[in-house]
A protein has these predicted regions:
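Vicinal oxygen chelate
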Residues: 1-6, 27-82, 86-115, 126-135
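Conserved catalytic core of two-component sensor histidine kinases
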Residues: 9, 16, 86
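Residue-level signal for the nucleotide or nucleotide-sugar donor/cofactor binding architecture
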Residues: 10-13, 80
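Conserved beta-strand-loop-alpha-helix junction that forms the acyl-donor binding cleft
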Residues: 12-14, 105-106
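Amphipathic alpha-helical segments
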Residues: 14-29
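Conserved active-site tyrosine of GNAT-family acetyltransferases
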Residues: 18-22, 92, 119
Length: 135
């Protein structure tokens, strides 16, 4: 079995600000799946992030929405170059996110990270698997 699409659902307080943030970072919006309760950010042809208002998110889960002082998930995305990694993180920070830690360079893999305007953690990576050390 193989998954053919992934939709990550995350709660947010403000749909419009979230839409503006991710557009400024450089991602497109699937308007067909967006409205005043949700915005669908297109990460790739098969990967989407559905940012849902906290109230709407609650209709899918009986568990409470975290209040911002806890971490339930860190979303990791892979890009095509170190430059793209820094471009995304720098654009996120320029639009209200904050950098989680200094970039990590492992030679074959490069990672940078940020907390978005809603407090969600993002690890942004580039990996050259042909250079991965063999143990």
């Amino acid at each position: 079995m193989k998954v053919n699409q992934i939709y990550v659902n995350l709660p947010v307080k403000d749909i419009q600000k979230t839409k503006e943030f991710w557009t400024r970072v450089g991602f497109s919006i699937n308007e067909q799946f967006s409205d005043d309760k949700a915005v669908c950010v297109v990460m790739s042809d098969t990967i989407y992030v559905m940012f849902l208002t906290e109230e709407y998110f609650q209709t899918f889960s009986e568990r409470p929405v975290p209040k911002g002082d806890t971490t339930q998930v860190l979303v990791a995305i892979g890009l095509n170059s170190r430059e793209e990694v820094d471009q995304v993180v720098n654009a996120a920070v320029a639009n209200g996110a904050y950098q989680h830690e200094e970039p990590q360079d492992y030679g074959w893999m490069y990672q940078n990270s940020f907390w978005d305007i809603n407090g969600h953690g993002w690890n942004v990576t580039f990996a050259d698997m042909s250079q991965m050390p063999q143990e």
